[in-house]
Amino acid sequence: MCFLVSCSGNIPFSEDEKGALKKAKTEIAEMKKNPTMAEKERILQKGLEVQKKYLRIGVVYFKSVEKDIPMADYYLARNYSARGENEEALKWARKGSNRGVKEASAFAGHIYANQRDEMNARKYYIKAMDQGDYREDTLFRVWVYGERKEINSEVVEAFKRNLNKNIEVKNALAFYYQRHDYFDEAEKLYKELVNEKYPNAERLLGELYMSKKDYDKAEEWLLKESENLFSHSEDNVKRIEEKRARLLRLLAKVYEMKGDYGKAENNLLKAKELAHKELALTSLAKLYEKQGKYNQALKINDELEELKKTKKRKIKS
């Protein structure tokens, strides 16, 4: 345990840190007189609190209870990482991972990813998922570090192991299949998501059909999503408007590919009034150019330039 010198090289503790260290030693000694799990949990929480001000002192608290509380390994890993001691951080992250701490597994994956060690990054992100970490970021990184020209069987098997444990896994696997043009497998999973009332599942299925260039089915499913999206409201107005604008832009693309430029234009005009106006305007200008309507395209490009200038002025102010 580190006392009069810091845990980071040979930099001595400041007077304030020495005071915090003395208090930590006293509190830990008291805990050892009555070493119940409740007392050890209290020491762990105290370490989290103290490290906000005295980062290096947090280690003292965490190490005093880590044998009995595996989560302390994760906190030690985060603490060392925050001080730039990545090898020490990795040591504790791996230890926590081996003790079943999903947060530690994901953090080990994060460290390996930063070291550009993709194989180990994938290994630990998969381990985190197997331990029950179904956060969007973790699932995303499982398939990102499984990205190659060919689909990665290790990643597929990992997703399949967890397929019925969390619905987000099914969505992640469907997307992974779609990225590698395994359209039939992706379609099956997206249809299951539709039946399970997964949010935006109709849109996801519509986008899959766009990838397959089956624009009739894409239109069918995007319109089903439209019925849901435009028939209810959300407390977060900005969020619902962004969802609606995105759907309208997708429908516009489908209609453009089907040669129905009128419907494509109408959807883009609606989309630009909701959210991300610049995206709708950019698509609208291209649509007009495609039809040889160059004067209208120029007007839209002028509107787009003015929008960019307005945004720059807002940023400066």
Residue ranges and their predicted role:
Residues 25, 78, 110, 143-144, ...:
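Residue-level recognition of tetratricopeptide repeat
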Residues 68-69, 99-101, 132-134, 165-166, ...:
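Short helix-capping/linker turns of helical repeat alpha-solenoids
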Residues 71, 103-105, 135-137, 168, ...:
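Start-of-helix register in tetratricopeptide repeats
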